[in-house]
Amino acid sequence: MSRFFVVIVSSILFTTFLSGSVLKEKVENIIGTKDYKMHNSLIGLLFKDESKYIINNQIKYLKVFNTLQENGLLNLRLNKPRDIEIEFQSSEKNFKSYKILNDVMHMIGYRYFFTKSMSIDDKQTLIWKILFKAEYMLDPVVLLNELRKNSANVIEVVNKGSNKWFYKIDFKNADLDSAIKIDNYEKVKFQKPLRAYMLKIEEAQSLQVISRNLNNWFPNIVFFDKDLKILKVIKKNRVYKGFKVKIPENTRYVKVTDLYNLINIKRGLSVIVR
């Protein structure tokens, strides 16, 4: 019995030590060895309770970055504009992963970046590398907060040095935060669009779109499943005042726009799902 107790205690102590070691190594990687050594005492105090930052053997990166930022330990400013490379990795190779990442980058103010490479490796992992020039590193707190809004889970973050960062993200249960949820039998009136309307629906059978007076709407409607795989596309080459269509099975998202130009629906559209 006492031997069993010793084994259990030893296991707990080893796990705690391992968690602390992994956490401290990660903090050192994020802020750099020089700053880590300079602020070692403060870091030891801030991350003393590892259970706040590691749950089920998974580092809670948003909490780690928040703690570093709130205590002045996350230096994002560069001495001059630099080329910055961000590598995103996702085991979900569907278009939804890319869509969410692209939307998030735009949402946090990064509209001028270009793709260095995009590929799927032997393990069917999506790897997307982007480049942009800036005086500040990409703020991980802002990025991770936006990803969380889309129910995307950050698995790993690595500072690779030379202004290169790596983010491994789980999109398995992700949902488009930019899509507007519409309940069955709810009528939603949309104002002048800045981009296509993206809708989120559940178990609806039909979609009705009503155009406003003085619009010249040429319907363009796309139905997607939960992974943003296209299920059906509708394009009409004449003006409609209204349009009703049966929703394909397994539809999760619907894009409603104009076939030619958003100016044709500048007075907005109304949508009803049933």
Model-derived regions: residue spans:
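C-terminal, beta-strand-rich globular interaction domains
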Residues: S178-R274
